[in-house]
Swiss-Prot record:
Residues 429-466 are annotated as: Disordered. It comes from Mycolicibacterium smegmatis (strain ATCC 700084 / mc(2)155). The lineage of its organism: Bacteria, Bacillati, Actinomycetota, Actinomycetes, Mycobacteriales. Full-length S1 protein and the C-terminal domain (residues 285-479) bind tmRNA, the interaction is not disrupted by POA. Unlike M.tuberculosis (strain H37Rv) the S1 motif 4 does not bind POA, which may explain why M.smegmatis is resistant to the antibiotic PZA, the precursor to POA. Belongs to the bacterial ribosomal protein bS1 family. NCBIfam families: PRK06676.1, PRK07899.1. GO terms for cellular component: ribonucleoprotein complex; ribosome. This is Small ribosomal subunit protein bS1. It holds the Pfam family S1. The gene is rpsA. It comes from the Bacteria. Binds mRNA, facilitating recognition of most mRNAs by the 30S ribosomal subunit during translation initiation. Plays a role in trans-translation; binds tmRNA (the product of the ssrA gene). Binds very poorly to pyrazinoic acid (POA), the active form of the prodrug pyrazinamide (PZA); POA does not disrupt trans-translation in this organism. M.smegmatis is resistant to the antibiotic PZA. Residues 36-105, 123-188, 209-277, 294-363 form the S1 motif domain.
Amino acid sequence: MPSPSVTSPQVAVNDIGSAEDFLAAIDKTIKYFNDGDIVEGTIVKVDRDEVLLDIGYKTEGVIPSRELSIKHDVDPNEVVSVGDEVEALVLTKEDKEGRLILSKKRAQYERAWGTIEELKEKDEAVKGTVIEVVKGGLILDIGLRGFLPASLVEMRRVRDLQPYIGKEIEAKIIELDKNRNNVVLSRRAWLEQTQSEVRSEFLNQLQKGAIRKGVVSSIVNFGAFVDLGGVDGLVHVSELSWKHIDHPSEVVQVGDEVTVEVLDVDMDRERVSLSLKATQEDPWRHFARTHAIGQIVPGKVTKLVPFGAFVRVEEGIEGLVHISELSERHVEVPDQVVQVGDDAMVKVIDIDLERRRISLSLKQANEDYTEEFDPSKYGMADSYDEQGNYIFPEGFDPETNEWLEGFDKQREEWEARYAEAERRHKMHTAQMEKFAAAEAEAANAPVSNGSSRSEESSGGTLASDAQLAALREKLAGNA
């Protein structure tokens, strides 16, 4: 049985209507653009001179390489790749060759202007990448070319701008003129605003009396500025040292790491007052802690006054030797006994921490002199327990008269103190010889040796106790 025949449907030309209807149907499938329109498309070809973009037009759109990026002389392959979806602005609907000419950078420019105008309105920062160094500053890619003057790159003028190439930075928009295609930026303004915010937060957390570490950032005649971590505080020259100084550079240098105490935080003026000397022991307290009344100490005469002589016994510490404490004989004026610049062994007879005064005596120091060396008089104060037994240095065995192993540091410290005490005794001996000659000349008569005027030390010292004297000799032998 023959199969039935299948016939194809017949379509008449007039099934789609008139010729006008046919052209209208074709027209609906074609996209139309005007100059200035922004279109979307897919990259279909990348050449050195141009890029082809499929935007659904009767022909591909052409993006000349110079219209790909705001950067100059770029390789198209570094900007786009086949398959990329991009936006472009219509420059010319049809050039001499009938091509649709597009610009990627102009589309980016138009989009960016809207964003930048909005940021400028809100006084917010814009973020961009440094793409070029030009005369007078930098060019940033912020969707368009933004100019950042060299004077506004940092808080201080930057000489070499090359290291900024490729860096992403934030800046405030200070000038904006679309008609002139002009965008001027300021990173310094952004830094000032940011640092001000950080500074306020930091100052709110900073407490009076707090101890902080910092780095000396600059030195001026009236003090030194210390960077505490983004916020600078001032150490006034009077707070740099316990001793008198003429210039801050005598104490610190730029770059020095220092420990300071916060004296005051002025929130209204955003100023921080610091002190370096407050973190260091008061030399007066140090002297009181390391010296006892009755000790004989070395000093240097610094000033003569009608009522006596001032003697410096430590850096920043001066005491008064009253005129009545200069000599056993009657003294009319201090220079009959001492001169400025003289070295003198003096006895500490009073320490007034509250008034920051030390009373000294040259006369009593000489009266206490003995030819036999007594370390306790010259800084090696003896220690005794409640039963009156001498407390030996840590690490020293009185039974064997030997230092124990593992106490090398204690031994070195003891021997150093012993050597210093011995040195002071020798200085005192020299002073006695000098003063004996001076007294003899002044009185025009010989005087007895200073040692005859002194009594033997009382018991309980390394010099007077037989057992402890043996220890002294042993320790002195190891010094």
